[in-house]
Regions:
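N-terminal pro-sequences and low-complexity stem/linker regions of secreted or lumenal proteins
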Residues: 1-134
C-alpha cells in the first residue's frame, strides 16, 4: 500500500458485509461475468455444465422466475457431493435429494433484470467472488 492508500483508510467509517444464505455466488451474481462482460469477476462461463445420472447434460441457463421452489441440500455430506469432481456434483445431488423435479434447475442463474437491487449493489461496491465459509 502506498502512503496515500493508508491515509484514505481513515475515511472509511463502516464496512458492511451482506451475505446471502443458501444462495451461491453464481446463482445471484455469476451473470456479471457471463452477461455483464466483467473480467474482474470469477463468475459464470458459457461452457459450464453438470451431468445427471441418466447422462443428460445440464448447462447453465437463465431462470424463468425468481422463485426457486426446492432447496438443495446444505448438510456436510450433500455439499461434499456437490463440490466434488471439480464442482460436478450439483445436478447429481439435487436430482437425488429433490425428485421428481428437473435436476437441471440447480444450474440456473438470475441476471440484472431479475435482481436490480443486487445488480446496483454489485456495480457500486466491492463484491467477494472468492468467498468461502463453513
Amino acid at each position: 500500500m502506498s502512503g496515500e492508500d493508508l491515509t484514505n483508510l481513515n475515511k472509511i467509517e463502516h464496512i458492511v458485509v451482506l451475505m446471502m444464505e443458501n444462495r451461491s455466488f453464481d446463482h445471484l451474481l455469476g451473470y456479471l461475468a457471463l452477461e455483464g462482460g466483467r473480467t474482474d469477476v470469477d463468475g459464470l462461463t458459457s461452457d459450464m455444465f453438470n451431468i445427471s445420472t441418466n447422462g443428460t447434460v445440464h448447462r447453465i441457463h437463465h431462470l424463468e422466475n425468481t422463485t426457486f421452489e426446492l432447496d438443495p441440500c446444505h448438510e456436510g455430506n450433500g455439499v461434499d457431493e456437490q463440490i466434488s469432481n471439480n464442482n460436478g456434483g450439483f445436478v447429481l445431488n439435487f436430482e437425488r435429494m429433490c425428485r421428481p423435479v428437473d435436476p437441471g434447475g440447480v444450474m440456473g442463474y438470475h441476471n440484472a433484470a431479475d435482481l436490480p437491487v443486487y445488480d446496483h449493489l454489485a456495480r457500486e461496491f466491492t463484491i467477494c467472488d472468492r468467498w468461502f465459509s463453513s
